[in-house]
Amino acid sequence: MSSFGFGLITAAVLAIATVGFTMQFAVTNVLNLAYGSVMINSAYVTYWVNQHGISVWLALFAGVFCGAVVSWCLNRVIYTPFQRRNLAPITVVIVSLGVDLMGTFGLQAIVGGSYVTYKMSQGHEFHFLGMFLSGVQLIIIGICAGVLILIHWLLKYTRLGKAMRATSANRNLARNSGVKTQFIISMTWIISGALCGLAGTVFAMNSGVFEATSNELYIVLLLAAMFLGGPGEPYGAMFGALAIGLSTEISAAYITADYKEVIAFLVLLGMLAFRPYGLFGSEKTL
């Protein structure tokens, strides 16, 4: 497959993850660095269900459910109590980093350090615009497109989506206008967690093989995509994911693939230094 094809698949997976990550940050004001850990744990839940003879496409729903439940629990048990104490935002970020380390290395202690793979067929290979894509990769792109359309519909045309946007813009004003902000925040954790679980599973499908620390550098890609598009901007996150996915994979054709995350890190540093509110955000976003 061409580097553009690899970039397209990477962007599709990253788009699902980044949109959930951005929504979570925008509505809840929590920069959840444990997002990658929840992704890989969800991928393993899908793997365990798949090992019992269930199709990976059905087992995928177990991963989505895991991401939603774990994210909701993290908010209720850990993040909300810290936020109620009116601590500095960086404190919650550090707490989320600790949660990430516990989630990743706790999983590694349970499953070991060996690589695993799903029981699935890659399907026929298709030639399209100079790219060779497997059936699974085409399905992943289709899932990404479907999810992004659903997120657009949710945010634009539903009462829940409008309440989420209002809570993100001004939580106190939304509360005074009758929006049940705590309920909206809980629903945001569930929805973004479901996206996290889905992203973890399709990430593992695309990787072919994975292990407990496969998410190690993924948070850098998430942060780069989010800050490129704009913190709290779901549509910006879609663009950021496409740009980061393509740039990291295309650059891997010219430098060793082991260092392709460096491109994302440089983008992240550049955005933080010169335009921290992103290409699609505004200064009031931060």
Feature map (PLM): residue ranges:
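Membrane-interfacial amphipathic/re-entrant helices at transmembrane-helix boundaries
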Residues: 1-16, 45, 54-59, 85-91, ...
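Inter-helical junctions in multi-pass inner-membrane proteins, predominant
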Residues: 1-13, 155, 188-225, 232, ...
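Short, non-helical or kinked segments that cap or interrupt transmembrane helices
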Residues: 21-42, 56, 86-90, 160-163, ...
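Alpha-helical transmembrane segments within multi-pass membrane transporters and channels
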Residues: 54-99, 239-244, 275-276
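Transmembrane helix-bundle core of multi-pass membrane transporters
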Residues: 81, 88-157, 184, 250, ...
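Helix-loop-helix "hairpin" substructures at the membrane interface of multi-pass membrane proteins
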Residues: 132-210, 234-240
